């Protein structure tokens, strides 16, 4: 039996929170020069991608404004092309895409819970 979408959405939020925690006080230069922060955030992006892949098709179809395929594709790239990871692109994802993802996932959870 497939888990409720809220389980996977909460996994996404947990990973987003960890990424925010790991990078909140970092400059881009600090991030780019520190493999520990890179590895920690890449792992959380992988989890976000895996959770996205497990969301029901009906949920993904209901929220087409989210680039679900791109999120899952980022996970695949990080898993399968780990020697070719563009750390600058990871930083851009953290600063540009993660905040937007957090906002929409919170809205989706509210919608699923029946809260306006």
UniProtKB/Swiss-Prot annotation:
Modified residues (O-di-AMP-tyrosine): 82
Keyword entries, A-Z: Hydrolase, Nuclease, Nucleotide-binding, Phosphoprotein, Toxin-antitoxin system
GO molecular function (one): RNA nuclease activity
Active-site residues per Swiss-Prot or TrEMBL entry: 75, 80
GO CC list: toxin-antitoxin complex
Uppermost EC category: hydrolase
Description of post-translational modifications: Modified by cognate antitoxin MA_1295; probably at least 2 successive AMPylation events occur on Tyr-82.
Enzyme nomenclature, EC number: 3.1.-.-
Residues spanned by motif RX(4)HXY motif: 75-82
PANTHER family: RNASE MJ1380-RELATED, UPF0331 PROTEIN MJ0127
Subunit architecture: Homodimer, probably forms a complex with cognate antitoxin MA_1295.
Family (UniProt): Belongs to the HepT RNase toxin family.
Listed name of the protein: Putative RNase MA_1296
Organism: Methanosarcina acetivorans (strain ATCC 35395 / DSM 2834 / JCM 12185 / C2A)
């Amino acid at each position: 039996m497939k888990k409720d979408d809220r389980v996977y959405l909460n996994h996404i939020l947990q990973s987003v929170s960890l990424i925010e925690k790991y990078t909140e006080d970092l400059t881009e230069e600090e991030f780019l020069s520190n493999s520990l922060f890179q590895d920690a955030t890449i792992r959380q992006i992988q989890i976000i991608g895996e959770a996205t892949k497990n969301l029901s098709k009906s949920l993904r179809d209901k929220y087409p404004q989210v680039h679900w395929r791109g999120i899952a594709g980022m996970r695949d790239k990080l898993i399968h092309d780990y020697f070719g990871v563009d750390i600058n692109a990871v930083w851009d994802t953290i600063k540009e895409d993660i905040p937007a993802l957090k906002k929409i996932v919170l809205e989706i959870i509210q919608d699923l819970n029946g809260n306006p």
